Each structure stands twice: as C-alpha cells, then as structure tokens.
Regions:
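Helix-loop boundary and gating motifs at the non-cytosolic
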Residues: 2-68, 72, 158, 235-275
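Helix-to-loop junctions at the C-terminal end of transmembrane segments
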Residues: 68-81, 173, 284-298, 390-391
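Flexible cytoplasmic inter-helical loops of multi-pass small-molecule transporters
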Residues: 206-225
Length: 421
C-alpha cells in the first residue's frame, strides 16, 4: 500500500488510520506487559542474585529508549512520517528473537542473561526512534477532537490486553513442563509474535504528505535551539521540572514485585497477577483520562495522576508493617498498590504529551516532544539507586525516596494553567 497519497485533506483517512493504530497499540501494549519490569526484575534476581543488576537493566532500557527521541526531532520537516516509524518498528521488534533463541538453544545461564540484556537494549533503542514520528503521524492523521478518544481508547484496550497477559504470565510461570529460564523465554516468544503481528497493521496505514515542508534544517541546529526554547517558555520549564520530579517514582516501582515476593511472602508464580492489577488500573482510568484530554483539562489530569501515584507509594510504605501485624485488609494492599500505579502511569503519559501538543506548532512540536521524552534519561539512573538502597537498607526508605519528589511535582502542577488555548 503506497504511503504517497496526493490528497489535500490530511484527515482524509482518519477513520482507517484510527482503527489500524488502535489495533497495533492494543497488541503492542499487550505484548510489552509480558516483559514488564516487575517480571524481568524477578527473572534477573533469580538468575544472578543481584538487585543492583536488576536496577542497571531497567536503567539501560529507559536510557536507550529516550535518547533516540532527541535524535528524531527533525521529522517535523519531513513530508511523510509513516515510512520512518514503520522501518524502525520492524527492526526493533525482530530484536526480541535474540533472547528467544538464546533461551532455548543455549545451556549457559550467563549467556541467556546476556541475551536478555541485548534484546531489551536493542528493542527499546530502535523503538525510541519511532516515538516522535509516530506522534507526529497521529497529530496529522487524527482530528484534534478525536485525539483524546484515540489515546484513551488505546490505553483502555491495551490495558484489557495486558490484563489477559497477566493471566497468561501466571499460567506460563507455573507450567510444570516449563522450567527456569525457559518459562521466561516463552514469555518473550509470545511477546515477539504479538509485536510482529502489529507490524502488519502498520503497513496498511495511509498518509497524505505535509505541505510546505522544509527538510534542509540540520539536526545539530535544532539541538542547539533547544536551550533557547526552554529559556523563553516558562510553561515548558515548569512542565519539565514536574515531569522530572514525578519520574522519581521509578526509584521504587521497578521493585514492587520483588518487594512482594521477598518481603511479604508472595509466591513468585503469582507475579502475573500484579500485571492484572496494574492493567486494571490503566483500563478503569483510561475513560476519565480520555474525557479530560478531550476537554483540554491537562492540569487536572496531571494532578490526578500525581495523587494516585502518591497513594500507591504510601500503600507500599505501610504494606510491610501491615503484613507483619496481620492487619485486617492487609491482603488488599498489593492489588490496590499496583492498581493505582497503573492508573497513574498512563495518565502522566497523556497529560504531558497533550500539553506539548497544545503549546507548540508543527515545527516546534517534534522538538519539544523529543526534548521532553529525552529528559527521562536524567532519571533513568534511579532504578540503579533503588537497587542499591534495597541491597543495604529497608524498603521503607526506598519508598520515601520516591514519595518526597512526587509531592514536589504536585505542588508545581498547581501553578500550571488549567486549560490550553
């Protein structure tokens, strides 16, 4: 199917593209939950005995995902966006097969661990190159009144798929004929199959070219202009600081599952249910989040997600003492903790990106999107810090380390404008 469609209306194919993008987003989100940080942190600690290595693993995944987004900020002048993100999507998703092949063909556990590092470094690396052109494609292909619905529906259907994958994770990890580490390799195999299925949907997208494009702007010149944009726009500066402070949740949340297994006595085979709880939160929250996005109430969305993340961290903080004292209702703390985390995580993605879409024009938009997302690299070291903390200090200190900056992000969010013009 050609991407070169000479039509004047950029939204001419919006219904077709809306459906295909929703289908790919659903299978993508379902697939990535099979290698959620909660799952792979347990795998790595079981394979290596090192919480530090588990933190490094998450740091690598985050860093290599966000840096390419800064290198993609020159897509605003490109007439076609589909060919850019589809190319990188195909390459990245194929990289998952490295871990699959090593798990079932190699006998050395160290080699298998190395293959997981390689697969989950290359996949997010190439996937990072898709984010800015994908968002640009969404903006040019889907009318503004439908974008909140699109993002909300993507989150909702994806969360439903993730709930199903949570049960699948539990089934695979408890399968008597799948021993460690083949059970984790099977999870990645299913993930790869789903990912490659999604590529088929992307190939049938249609795209009208942008008018009056300027492809001659050098990437280096765009990068040099980023400090000026940040310096001159107070809202951008505040949004960056809010995002950085909020992201400090990642000191703690990668270790939620490990905390439940090692400190609260939850069976390892039950970690799949953690994904179910987390994705149930995303599913339930997707409807109010979509409504707020359509109305442009991004300040309210930021504040809501911050409060939910704070509540999740506070529940984690009291869970240890509650379980030790066998307090009434203690067994509900873990499901609620993951539920609130899932709801908050999806809301922050929508709120920040909708703010950027609302305050920038076509030329500035990819620059801001790439910059905002690349700043997550600053906080990518936080899971390593979390791994060090729990190696020597109580989990309670770990959770406090996240709670304080999240409170700071809430205070800053109160000073943002309620709606965008």
């Amino acid at each position: 199917m050609s991407t070169d469609d000479p039509v004047d209306d950029p939204y001419a194919y919006w219904k077709r593209n809306f459906l295909l993008l929703i289908l790919d987003s659903t299978v993508f989100m379902t697939a990535v939950s099979l290698s959620d940080v909660s799952i792979l942190s347990v795998f790595l600690v079981k394979a290596t005995g090192s919480t530090f290595l588990a933190g490094v693993f998450q740091m690598v995944r985050v860093t290599v995902f966000f840096i390419p987004q800064l290198l993609s900020i020159n897509v605003g002048g490109k007439p076609y966006k589909k060919r850019i993100f589809v190319k990188w999507t195909m390459v990245g998703r194929c990289c998952l097969l490295i871990a699959v092949l090593a798990t079932f063909l190699a006998r050395d556990l160290h080699l298998i661990v190395l293959s997981f590092f390689l697969s989950f470094a290359l996949f997010p690396l190439f996937d990072g190159f898709t984010v800015v052109p994908w968002l640009e494609y969404v903006v040019k292909s889907i009318p503004p009144p439908k974008r909140g619905t699109f993002f909300g529906l993507s989150q909702g259907l994806g969360a439903a798929g993730m709930i199903a994958s949570g049960f699948l994770i539990t089934l695979i990890l408890n399968a008597p004929h799948l021993i460690f580490p083949q059970n984790y390799g099977t999870l990645v195999l299913v993930e790869a199959i789903l990912m490659l299925t999604g590529v088929g949907f992307l190939l049938y997208l249609r795209e009208a070219p942008d008018a009056a494009t300027t492809d001659d702007t050098r990437l280096l010149d765009l990068l040099k202009g980023i400090p000026r944009i940040i310096r001159e726009d107070e809202m951008v500066r505040r949004l960056i600081l809010i995002q950085l402070l909020f992201s400090c949740y990642s000191v703690s949340t990668p270790f939620y599952a490990l905390f439940a297994v090692t400190q609260l006595g939850v069976n390892e085979g039950q970690v799949g249910f953690f994904i179910v709880y987390q994705m149930a939160g995303r599913l339930v929250a997707s409807f109010p989040w979509a409504h707020l996005c359509n109305k442009g109430h991004n300040k309210q969305l930021l504040q809501s997600t911050g409060l939910l993340m704070l509540a999740s961290l506070l529940l984690a903080l009291v869970a240890g003492a509650s379980y030790a004292a066998d307090a009434p209702g203690a067994s509900l703390l873990i499901p609620l903790m993951f539920f609130l985390y899932g709801a908050a995580f999806s809301g922050m993605f929508l709120a920040v990106n909708n703010y950027v879409l609302g305050i920038s024009d076509r030329q500035q938009r990819p620059i801001l999107l790439g910059t905002m997302n690349a700043l997550y690299v600053v906080t990518s070291i936080l899971p390593v810090l979390g791994g060090i903390i729990i190696a020597y200090l109580p989990y309670e200190l770990l959770f406090v380390t996240s709670i304080v900056p999240v409170v700071g992000s809430l205070l800053l969010a109160s000073r943002l404008r309620q709606t965008l013009d």
